[in-house]
Amino acid sequence: VHNIGHAARIIAYGDADVMVAGGAEKASTPLGVGGFGAARALSTRNDNPQAASRPWDKERDGFVLGDGAGMLVLEEYEHAKKRGAKIYAELVGFGMSSDAYHMTSPPENGAGAALAMANALRDAGIEASQIGYVNAHGTSTPAGDKAEAQAVKTIFGEAASRVLVSST
């Protein structure tokens, strides 16, 4: 996600008209599986993999490890219109944070996630009331779920229960 945000800023600053951005991760290595297993962060519901990862569920027991990659082509709006491109979405803001709280657990108050959301809202020049959906990390771990839920409550206040939240 950081690469996408940085690519959008490069375009916004006028340093490029088009950028390809994204990333890849391969965590399902012996070291990755062993580390997450030792941290008790992996779901043990191997008998029902479709329901194993359940962020924010009271019966959650961890996440399902997977690998993935994704790439996007970002293009300056007028440049895209000029060439007749089909425009799928507009990235209006980007935010990030890094709190270095703990190697695997966020602070309970979700300060880092709340700061990233606040930074994205500020960058976009919009209010939290204009947001209807949050794509969260959703690790299905007690510490991660609690921190993310608190971050959403911090940013959206009383409206937090009306904002749709899911995870990748």
Question: What kind of region is each of these model predictions?
Answer:
Residues 1-6, 15, 38-64, 150-168:
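Conserved catalytic cysteine-centered active-site region
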Residues 2-3, 27-31, 100:
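Short, well-ordered, mixed-charge alpha-helical segments that flank or form enzyme active sites
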Residues 10, 24-35, 128-146:
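Conserved beta-ketoacyl condensing-enzyme motif
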Residues 16-24, 86-94, 129-136, 163-168:
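Beta-strand segments within the central parallel beta-sheet cores of soluble alpha/beta enzyme folds
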